[in-house]
Amino acid sequence: MKILYSLRRYFHVETLFNGTLALGGRDQESTGFAWWAGNARLINLSGKLLGAHVAHAGLIVFWAGAMNLFEVAHFVPEKPMYEQGLILLPHLATLGWGIGPGGEVINTFPYFVSGVLHLISSAVLGFGGVYHALIGPETLEESFPFFGYVWKDKNKMTTILGIHLILLGAGALLLVAKAIWFGGLYDTWAPGGGDVRKITNITLNPSTIFGYLLKSPFGGEGWIVSVDNMEDIVGGHVWLGIICIFGGIWHILTKPFAWARRAFVWSGEAYLSYSLAAISLMGFIACCFVWFNNTAYPSEFYGPTGPEASQAQAFSFLVRDQRLGANVGSAQGPTGLGKYLMRSPTGEIIFGGETMRFWDLRAPWLEPLRGPNGLDLSKLKKDIQPWQERRSAEYMTHAPLGSLNSVGGVATEINAVNYVSPRSWLSTSHFVLGFFFFVGHLWHAGRARAAAAGFEKGIDRDSEPVLYMEPLN
């Protein structure tokens, strides 16, 4: 019986399949992997793997540019961003481009520029990807030793890690630069309903910044997702940028300690599994951030959070009925609790009714009406501004409750707009992707550990039908 595939396929993934570095790299015979196994064919071909990664980056940046221009072309300035299904323009708006007071879009040209810049850079990346995939050297070790590597080379791997950390740190500091010097960021908490402003008084106190990391992740505490002011967000990026850059320098200058050499599996597939775990964690954190946080993800662009829409409904009816003569401080609801206002278990005055569960919501349209002990009755009677009424009515009818077939809105709200909020899309997609990336982490970690332990022999193929079929050609 003729064996049509490489038995090396079943041994430790770092084996060079033909004993030399001059690999074909495109067929099953030379790599032990079939065409559909994708980059697995390129495990030991650093030049070709570079091409695959650069081309992948080109595809990502092309999508960003094309989708950006698509959103600009379809954008209607009279409607809020979140009602138009936009997921990229809200991010640009949050960075302060083209935005005036109250989150109003006053200039779409910066969005057009962003799209064009991404398209142009995607062309450069695409050319580089095709060049390295088809023309450039198969391996970089000989011609460009700085860019070459062997997966088992622990020192080189931590050097590459260090370079990545420095780039991430520089990215964090770019946001800081935009906030302080280059026009500022959109701050939803700016007086009068939000505005773009330079963030000058940034929080650098380590007890404040790292205090977020030590908080409980549960209600009322909310871990890092509870950040509610731009000063802390920008200060956090300062700390993160500096830590990443110094960590990167450390990893470039040092070799892994003995405990690290023993603790980790040092192979390409192991690094893939570590990366997938990290991205999975980031996906889950992003899911919580976009769902609950209305400072980093301002409701003017992403739509209200769930608790915010619920509290807005209670507020809107309080405003309406107060105008009709209701005494909102003492009116009783059907359960004997306050109809409009009630006390929380700890004594604060909160909105009554079903929205009591969201009593710890903080939102820029509501906070001015609070006093030292929760909502302030005299402010509710005298100080409500028209912009607060308008915004609350808008949020009440745009709850982020929509199924993916677009049946949206609160079932009990007659005026709900039938749409799916970008908050729903972004949090759901990041949760689902975070989950699948975690499964990918488990899969590749298991394979990498088995290969390192020497018992990864693959699936037993002795009885596979393909072994006794005639080749197609």
From Swiss-Prot:
Q: Which residues hold [CaMn4O5] cluster?
A: 367
Q: Which cysteines are joined by disulfide bonds?
A: none
Its transmembrane ranges are 69-93, 134-155, 178-200, 255-275, 291-312, 447-471
- An individual GO BP term: photosynthetic electron transport in photosystem II
Question: Would you say which domain of life the source belongs to?
Answer: Eukaryota
Cofactor note from UniProt? Binds multiple chlorophylls and provides some of the ligands for the Ca-4Mn-5O cluster of the oxygen-evolving complex. It may also provide a ligand for a Cl- that is required for oxygen evolution. PSII binds additional chlorophylls, carotenoids and specific lipids.
Q: Where in the cell is it found?
A: Plastid, Chloroplast thylakoid membrane
Q: Which residues form the propeptide?
A: 1-14
**Residues where N-acetylthreonine is found:** 15
User: How does this protein lie in the membrane?
Assistant: Multi-pass membrane protein
Main localization is plastid
**Would the keyword Transport turn up in this protein's UniProt record?**
no
**Gene Ontology MF terms:** chlorophyll binding; electron transporter, transferring electrons within the cyclic electron transport pathway of photosynthesis activity; metal ion binding
Q: Which UniProt keywords apply?
A: Acetylation, Chlorophyll, Chloroplast, Chromophore, Manganese, Membrane, Metal-binding, Phosphoprotein, Photosynthesis, Photosystem II, Plastid, Thylakoid, Transmembrane, Transmembrane helix
Q: Which Pfam families match?
A: PSII
The record's annotation in InterPro entries points to:
PS_antenna-like, PS_II_antenna-like_sf, PSII_PsbC, PSII_PsbC_sf
Q: Name one GO cellular component term.
A: photosystem II
Q: Does the keyword Transmembrane apply?
A: yes
What positions are modified (Phosphothreonine)? 15
Q: What does this protein do?
A: One of the components of the core complex of photosystem II (PSII). It binds chlorophyll and helps catalyze the primary light-induced photochemical processes of PSII. PSII is a light-driven water:plastoquinone oxidoreductase, using light energy to abstract electrons from H(2)O, generating O(2) and a proton gradient subsequently used for ATP formation.
Q: Which NCBIfam families match?
A: PS_antenn_a_b (TIGR03041), psbC (TIGR01153)
Q: Which family does it belong to?
A: Belongs to the PsbB/PsbC family. PsbC subfamily.
- What assembly does the database describe for this protein? PSII is composed of 1 copy each of membrane proteins PsbA, PsbB, PsbC, PsbD, PsbE, PsbF, PsbH, PsbI, PsbJ, PsbK, PsbL, PsbM, PsbT, PsbX, PsbY, PsbZ, Psb30/Ycf12, at least 3 peripheral proteins of the oxygen-evolving complex and a large number of cofactors. It forms dimeric complexes.
What is the official name of this protein in its record? Photosystem II CP43 reaction center protein
Q: Which organism is it from?
A: Chara vulgaris (Common stonewort)
This protein's gene is called psbC
